[in-house]
Curated annotation (Swiss-Prot):
Residues 211-345 form the PADR1 zinc-binding domain. CDD domains: BRCT_PARP1 (cd17747), parp_like (cd01437), WGR_PARP1_like (cd08001). ADP-ribosyltransferase activity is regulated via an allosteric activation mechanism. In absence of activation signal, parp1 is autoinhibited by the PARP alpha-helical domain (also named HD region), which prevents effective NAD(+)-binding. Activity is highly stimulated by signals, such as DNA strand breaks. Binding to damaged DNA unfolds the PARP alpha-helical domain, relieving autoinhibition. Residues 348-361 have a biased composition (Pro residues). NAD(+) binds at residues 845-847, 854, 861, 887. Homodimer; PARP-type zinc-fingers from separate parp1 molecules form a dimer module that specifically recognizes DNA strand breaks. The two PARP-type zinc-fingers (also named Zn1 and Zn2) specifically recognize DNA strand breaks: PARP-type zinc-finger 1 binds PARP-type zinc-finger 2 from a separate parp1 molecule to form a dimeric module that specifically recognizes DNA strand breaks. This is Poly [ADP-ribose] polymerase 1. Zn(2+) 1 binds at residues 8, 11, 40, 43. Residues 190-201, 492-506 have a biased composition (Basic and acidic residues). It comes from Xenopus laevis. Residues 771-997 form the PARP catalytic domain.
Amino acid sequence: AKSGRASCKKCGDNIAKESLGLAIMVQSPMFDGKVPHWHHYSCFWKRARVLSQGDIYGYTELRWEDQEMIKKAIETGGAAAGAGGDSKGGKGEMTLNDFAAEYAKSNRSACKGCEQKIEKGQIRISKKSVDVERPQLGMIDRWYHPDCFVSSREELDFLPSYSASQLKGFTILSAEDKDSLKKKLPAVKNEGKRKADEVDGHSAATKKKIKKEKEKESKLEKLLKEQTELIWHIKDELKKVCSTNDLKELLIANKQQVPSGETNIVDRVSDGMAFGALLPCEECSGQFVFKGDAYYCTGDLSAWTKCVAKTQTPNRKDWVTPKEFHEIPYLKKFKFKRHDRAFPPCAAPTPISPPAAPEPKPTVEETFPEGKPLTNTKVLLIGKLSKNKDEVKTLIEGLGGKVAGSAHKANLCISTNKEVKKMSKKMEEVKAANVRVVSDDFLKEVESGKSVQELLSQFGISSWGAEIKQEAVQPTEKQPSSGPVAGKSSGKVKEEKGSNKSEKKMKLTVKGGAAIDPDSELEDSCHVLETGGKIFSATLGLVDITRGTNSYYKLQLIEHDRDSRYWVFRSWGRVGTVIGSKKLEEMSSKEDAIEHFLNLYQDKTGNAWHSPNFTKYPKKFYPLEIDYGQEEDVVKKLSVGAGTKSKLAKPVQELIKLIFDVESMKKAMVEFEIDLQKMPLGKLSKRQIQSAYSILSQVQQAVSESLSEARLLDLSNQFYTLIPHDFGMKKPPLLNNLEYIQAKVQMLDNLLDIEVAYSLLRGGADDGEKDPIDVKYEKIKTDIKVVAKDSEESRIICDYVKNTHADTHNAYDLEVLEIFKIDREGEYQRYKPFKQLHNRQLLWHGSRTTNFAGILSQGLRIAPPEAPVTGYMFGKGIYFADMVSKSANYCHAMPGSPIGLILLGEVALGNMHELKAASQITKLPKGKHSVKGLGRTAPDPSATVQLDGVDVPLGKGTSANISDTSLLYNEYIVYDIAQVNLKYLLKLKFNYKGGMMW
């Protein structure tokens, strides 16, 4: 302990200066970071669980005797013997403080293994661990049935040397229950003796090898002991004879950075005197610092990302002691002798991030193997399956998936028809969570290599089930289908949000040009100060994937509506959680308030408030361009009394309501992991979205060229800072594969369309004479008429829907609710030159309902130049299909929201460049007007009819006699927006059969 001021979090007494204290690092509720909870050495083991010395940050920098003491405690499972421990479980045994046995006090607890109730009075065994979503609670009991605990013994870290009699509370059990537990949880015989027996049975060569290994271990331990004693001898002498300023001068003389804190300064000087002065990092010229398992660079690769260089053999030069220090006898006598630093086996280098500070149980972020059929799929198992659950779990993990513990964490359930009919409580939870259920035959077929998406439909046994999305897209359907920029799916499994996620809905009160943060509690009587056209409000972001931080900082200067009173309000925390705090300061004058605001902004960003060009600095925040132009109440007008005065046909009114549905927009943004608290709907500027596109292009290039992970870190930090994401307590994922990049491109596509819809919703005030629906209808500048159900064109279009539903898309049937004839203002004039082109077809194009305000008002668009080309099978263009269900999949309907919209457009295809595999088209070959991706199945060409002089390929799907193509169905792509004339919009109902296929 550096001082005697810290108090133990277990017993409350002070921890004496220079005594050994151990801390558990927990998430601070006040800011986006962790804080140490210090404990006396003896108290620590009653609360924490340590598996190896490497789990304790700073272990190798302790005195040798302290290292040995900790090592022994870890070997005994952190057990406490005698004083400070629980009762002894048996002769010479120590009680394990993080494992306990008792009789259940009620029937409310559930087993963490099988998830069934533990009945009152039954024996239950607990393993103490930290709840990753509520780490501030410390170690909490996770209860198991005895048999479930036994089956999970290894993964629960109940070591072979442990026995049931060491469980806390074992002594109060009945004799019968003690005997039962002893049989179920026996200790493995003495490892040392067993190893000796094994050695005796080995050949002479093996014995010699084992002997050499032991000698090597012994030699390393001796070296580590000598090294530690040398370092501590230097430290002790320096503390006696040198002032802090002397030590700083020594560091400067050896061209080493001077850290803050006396202890850190002593550590740096002693390291240099023992091993040599460290040379700068070759990557960034930063300072290397010893941190337990290696030397880590503390410099920055860029303004966005810290350097990730680490090594156990850094370059050094001899340590020099300037002559002016020869007045100090110890330094005068000191003769530098170069040593190479030795590292213990438990301190092997770990990837990228520095070693974690001591935590009771390290939490590993869930990862999925790439390129496997069940990658990103979390599977819940219910009921008695054809194989035992351990075998099924192994099979699922082999296919790239993970077994989930509960319905709300799963996106697929494997069970039986019997369980579905029985509708147990667990199955009710599955239904409530809208998780699709399949039989275990599904796994056998997946293992054989068949298409996952088709099998999901084939083996579905529930009448419910939400869309299952995977990052890895199936090869035959990898290409974008029919979206304005090649389909607009999030392409990302929806992660479960932590319990720390903020659920409150913020009501933003806009006065003048900005919304007052409601956390200030001044919104009713105040406004944000605006002077010289500059609004004194800033929202800042900072993401550091290496550290796992995802922080925000909000700053406002607030002025009273009537009085001359001023406040500076600031709030900070972790995006998407309730972690954070705030501060409201009343200032004595306007001038003082402005000065304080400017100083805070400069401190957090490194930039002057009035600076025209912002420069990002390392470890500093970056401003988000957020436009609080209108109150949300203006947007809500559409739903209040809408339609009462409308002159539009009822079906058209319902269509306008559907495409301007604010709740659907919010749901889409949540699905994309967008943080609605820090980035309210429609508030992020178009320029910032375009900047994010540009970053994704750079990410794509970096991935394609296999550039360093440090470069990907840098770009990922930039992207997540520009577009605030809600990852809860999870670490922001690295943008390191093309599928995830494409998912983020599609997210930005949708954000742009939502931004268009929202700007139409809130743009311009009406006089109150017109119905809100009519006002929005006029803004999309599209003539929309209802097509009569008994008309010829309705019959043709309905046949087109019925006949071109693909066999593999059999999870749902499509029901045509309405057909609208549409005429976008100015589109026909733009299309007119292509009207004379041959080969004009009426083709399908599907998209989310939230995108249709943008599509109708601005037309189908091609991906912007800033967007990366990844994910577009045939380059950036507008994609169409001749099979309705291929495009319908891109409507992103689901059982809980079964209504979708799909377009029929007249497309001037002309001479088609026919392809069977992906090709990044940037310029069509001479004489070609479009691209056709050849599919294995296509509408029967003999059944094609004409509608207003345009071919309608409404024949039933039949084999195209093309076997060497990577596409299941045809794709049509044009690269000039003028080649498209939108003709019809269909409102469809997706009638799901037994689940959903994507």
